[in-house]
A protein has these predicted regions:
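Residue-level detector of conserved catalytic or cofactor/ligand-binding positions
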Residues: 356-361
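Conserved alpha/beta-hydrolase
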Residues: 122-140
Length: 361
């Protein structure tokens, strides 16, 4: 992939007293959340007694090497549904004071040991306190049934991460941003529209999961197609109820048919090989619950993105099959602090592995 530089990308983020600017220099892909208002927050978090108890793996089991530039710890927090979420926290070595913080999640069907952890660790090397979290029902996080997604709860998880970060004594609560990858890019935008505590939002290789489930790729589904899909999935609900469990969608197809679309082959090249396989990843194994699609068909997640007032950066590959999701979302954003970055020559999954290099202009 050919490097792409932005030497003078300015996002102004202000309050009633001052305006601050963020300069972003990106080689390959990424963002920086800088120079926001400082504040003091002495709150402490009280554990929710109704929260799930999690059994977290303490060994390093990521799909990427551990950095010697950051401290790594396992942490947990909970969303407002009482679901306990597991996260990897990355903090610069010898960091002092209150830091800007970023919560990272995605891709859709992935776990924190894959792409989101790679992003979070890299950002921590550049001075941020970051968490990469498993969404509800995924990986080491709580919630049943397993391998479920939800337009509401998957969005809520980002705000839950902000809850957690905002009460940490080493985080500046006025300098918290979120980063969503693939399907979690759409959830990140949805969270930003609903939660003014989020001061900047970045999406990487974004999917609008409501749109793709309701309309198919490139919006090719008809009303009749959608009816037949609803009928099939509703019948699956009956089968699941009788069986006492939930049928999975099978994850990334394996082996890949020769006539499969190129992006399916690219997914396989990541999730089903040593590049990205992880034993807790739905995509790497048996997938998401089939009936999860029903909620997305009926509940659009990007209804209010025009009302986002904080900074937004959308990053996508030039050759990605999913590029239109970012471009269409960008057209709808009304805020002054918005940018879209198209990476020349990159496909959807190139942005899963391309490390981010952030430097001063």
């Amino acid at each position: 992939m050919k490097p792409y530089n932005i030497s003078h990308m300015i996002m102004s983020i202000g309050n009633h007293k001052k305006n601050y600017v963020m300069k972003i220099n990106v080689v390959s892909i990424f963002i920086v959340l800088l120079a926001l208002t400082s504040c003091v927050n002495n709150s402490t978090s009280k554990r929710n007694k109704n929260m799930d108890t999690l059994n977290l793996t303490q060994k390093w089991d990521k799909t990427f090497p551990k950095s010697d530039k950051v401290e790594h710890t396992k942490v947990t927090f909970h969303n407002r549904y009482g679901i306990a979420l597991a996260a990897d926290l990355y903090k610069p070595q010898n960091a002092q004071g209150r830091l800007a913080a970023i919560a990272v999640s995605g891709p859709y069907g992935a776990v924190k040991e894959q792409v989101s952890g790679r992003y979070a660790q890299t950002l921590a090397e550049y001075g941020f306190l970051t968490i990469a979290f498993d969404p509800s029902y995924y990986g080491e996080s709580g919630g049943t049934p397993r391998n479920l997604t939800s337009p509401e709860i998957s969005t809520e998880d980002f705000s839950a991460a902000v809850d957690y970060l905002s009460v940490r004594k080493d985080v500046d609560a006025q300098r918290i941003g979120i980063l969503g990858i693939c399907g979690w890019g759409g959830f990140a935008l949805n969270a930003a529209a609903n939660d003014p505590r989020i001061k900047a939002t970045v999406t990487s290789t974004m999917y609008d999961m409501s749109r793709v489930n309701a309309n198919g790729y490139f919006d090719k589904m008809t009303v009749d197609d959608r009816y037949e899909l609803r009928k099939k999935l509703s019948e699956q609900r009956t089968e699941d109820y009788l069986a006492g469990n939930y049928e999975r969608d099978g994850g990334v197809v394996n082996p890949v048919p020769e006539d499969a679309p190129l992006f399916v082959k690219q997914y396989h090249d990541y999730y089903k090989t040593e590049r990205g396989y992880h034993r807790r990843s739905p995509n790497s194994n048996d997938g998401i619950n089939k009936t999860a699609t029903l909620a997305f068909i009926n509940m659009p997640i990007l209804s209010y993105i025009e009302e986002i007032r904080s900074a937004v950066l959308l990053v996508h590959g030039e050759q990605a099959h999913s590029r239109y999701f970012s471009e269409d979302a960008f057209k709808r954003l009304k805020g002054e602090n918005k940018e879209i970055l198209i990476i020349p020559g990159a496909n959807h999954t190139d942005l899963y592995l391309s490390l981010i290099h952030i430097s001063e202009p």
